[in-house]
Amino acid sequence: MTTVINRKYRISRRLGINLWGRAKDPVNRRKYPPGQRGILGFKRLSDFGKQFAAHKKFKFYYAISSKQLRRIFLDAYNRKGYTADNFIGILESRLSSVLYHSGLVPTIYSAKQLISHKHVTVNDKIVNIPSYRVKPGDIVKIRERAAKIPVIVEAVQKQERKAPDYLEADSKEYSVKYLRIPQYSEVPYSADMEVNLVVEFYSR
């Protein structure tokens, strides 16, 4: 887990933002890229560079590949309504996202790991696919044996992140209910994710 967290810190410094809002993130003190020449600062980005950087924010925040992110965008684009809202709605309906934003796990990576190891249920059925689409009304729960894992116990005890309004978390039952599909402004991002630039990036 320490290796994963250190990798996350490096990603934050590369992007120049505290992507996950962790208090100990080195980017809070060193606002320049990692590496020997990082202290020289960030280069001024072109319009494409800004769009590409915004796309990377979402890729790293949700711990998914560029290919997956593009597929999600195309799905959002082909739906009725605003593409940006559709895009966020799909990302936030992923099982790993619901579990992470519940505050019952410390990181998006730990959420994905728990799911992959069959420690999570949706409506009392085991689901081991992090990208599984949760529907409004579904109840996601960490199985009893996994609730004793130290990082889970610590996350629940600390309650560093409060579940957003579209989720109803129950720390005693290690469960979270997905109430509704959120809009961009409701998601508790720690940084400006610039979703409009992502739409521009994929619309080129």
UniProtKB/Swiss-Prot annotation:
Pfam families: Ribosomal_S4, S4. InterPro entries: Ribosomal_uS4, Ribosomal_uS4_bac-type, Ribosomal_uS4_N, S4_RNA-bd, S4_RNA-bd_sf. Keywords: Ribonucleoprotein, Ribosomal protein, RNA-binding, rRNA-binding. GO terms for cellular component: small ribosomal subunit. GO terms for molecular function: rRNA binding; structural constituent of ribosome. SUPFAM superfamilies: Alpha-L RNA-binding motif. One of the primary rRNA binding proteins, it binds directly to 16S rRNA where it nucleates assembly of the body of the 30S subunit. With S5 and S12 plays an important role in translational accuracy. This is Small ribosomal subunit protein uS4.
